[in-house]
Amino acid sequence: MSEQTALEQKLWEGIVQYPEEFVEKYIAKGYWIGQTLSDFFIECAKKYAQNTAIICGERHFSYVQLQQHIDEFAVYLSKQGYQIGDSVVIQLPNIAEFFIAYFGALRIGMRPIMSLPAHRHAEVSHFIGQTQAKLYICADRFMGFDYRKLALECKQRCESLQQVLVVGDSGEISGFTTWPDLSKYQQQRVVPPNLTARHVAFFQLSGGSTGTPKLIPRTHDDYLYSVRASAVICELNQATKMLMVLPVAHNFSMSSAGSLGLFYAGGT
């Protein structure tokens, strides 16, 4: 078995692919354009370079600045040994680091699992176990809850989990790392992974169901069609300002038209 064949098997394990006739129709109609989410934001950063992408408290990030941080975080992840197809659980509040972590992980072919701030041990440990996630990114504290305690429980019980990356104070717990100084990686870049827009980009979570949320695989192609169409329907443009109140990792907050739709239009 070739290395590429083995990688494809890993990437599609447990995933039901779109029927080929559907794929051909979506491509023919222009719904799917073969763009990855990573390349999507790179294009946004080129098109709207000096526009303000995010205001996070007192911090303002232009599109080009946000892309710079994404590139730097991708280098950091690569230097930690993460590879194409590795899973990462991201559980962060509505802060800039969420987008840096999300797009940085996608940049090297990792697959984020979009955990919400309200999730606790039962949910997070399930996400880690189901995907064999190697990395868990969380805040130190948010809304009175200490995520480091949750992370420690997961680290002790989930064999696949290699690292906990904390935005804030990591508490000097063994196996925990504080969010890196990204300026150390300014002059470095990663080699883009050998992935197509038809591959699974990340996993979102089912809503309204009973029990533990189910993982929903989203491909680059299918997700970006929703983003582009929603941005047009909502008539977003470069003058649009969006106050993000709902959890940023939620599907509605990301793509309906959400933050990604806003990026597509060049808004803030």
Each predicted region: which residue ranges?
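Flexible, non-catalytic linker and terminal segments flanking ANL/adenylate-forming cores
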Residues: 1-34
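Flexible, low-complexity linker/hinge segments
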Residues: 25-35, 173-200
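A short helix-loop-beta submotif of the ANL/AMP-binding
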Residues: 93-113, 117-121, 129-135, 240-241, ...
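Conserved AMP-binding/adenylate-forming core of the ANL superfamily
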Residues: 31-42, 50-95, 99-103, 120-125, ...
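Structural core segment of the AMP-binding/adenylate-forming
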Residues: 1-8, 110-180
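Conserved pre-ATP/AMP-binding loop-to-beta segment of ANL
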Residues: 49, 183-207, 212, 217-221, ...
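AMP-dependent adenylate-forming
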Residues: 13-24, 39-62, 167-174, 203
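Conserved AMP-binding/adenylation subdomain of ANL enzymes
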Residues: 224-241, 251-268
